[in-house]
Amino acid sequence: MKKSIRQIYYNAFSRFYDRFVALHSSDAQGAAREYLSNMVPASEGDRILDMCTGTGSLLLRLRKRLERGGLVVGVDFSRGMLHVNQKRTETYENICLVEADVASLPFPAQSFDAITCSHAFYELKGESQERSLQEILRVLKPGKVFFMMEHDLPEKPLVRAMFYLRLASMGAKSAINILRHEKMMLRRYFRSVEKVITPTGRSKIMICRK
């Protein structure tokens, strides 16, 4: 399969991804991801999907929630990210990695009890965002929740410049729409949408109930 420019970029970026996110969120110890994982309801036998799973930092926390039985599935289109992820997670039987486009998920309808996406949704372009939200609705069980964690506007000038550069890669119109109309966009798909600020104050979590 021919690789897109974005896949090539993320394959190369996989070696620096965790440090980049820590710098953006002022969260070197992963407190925001820990906070997110603790918000996700988990019962024995549940299946949780982590979209744009990257190098697996959130997966490792989510799998602890299902130690009594269940499965955490990580999906990413970047083989480089998944390679780093696999090195971290291959010893855990309740973690499964899948190389796929989140805009076309290879799972049956109503497969998951919760879905997460950490610091990645903003990077999906235009139609991919719309299709991804449609796919989330398709594979999420009725009444269950999609948790989307993203950076709030950074205070440090250098980090803010990097944040704007990241948004610019999405296209100006898409970036402005997300920043100004995030809740409105999500409410087109979900029954309820709530915004929570993480304890670090640098990230936000959108809690979207189907």
Region locations from a protein language model:
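A short SAM/SAH-binding and catalytic strip from SAM-dependent methyltransferases
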Residues: 114-127
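Conserved class I S-adenosyl-L-methionine
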Residues: 1-41, 57, 61, 162-164, ...
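A short glycine-rich, Lys/Arg-flanked "PGG" loop and its adjoining helix->strand segment in the class I
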Residues: 130-142
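Helix-to-beta-strand junctions that scaffold the AdoMet/dcAdoMet cofactor pocket
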Residues: 67, 124-126, 140-142
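A short acidic, Gly/Pro-enriched loop at the edge of an enzyme's catalytic core
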Residues: 103-115
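Short glycine-centered segments of the SAM/dcSAM-binding site in methyltransferase folds
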Residues: 47, 71, 143-145
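C-terminal alpha-helical "lid/dimerization" subdomain adjacent to the S-adenosyl-L-methionine
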Residues: 4, 147-200
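Class I SAM-dependent methyltransferase SAM/SAH-binding core
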Residues: 49-104
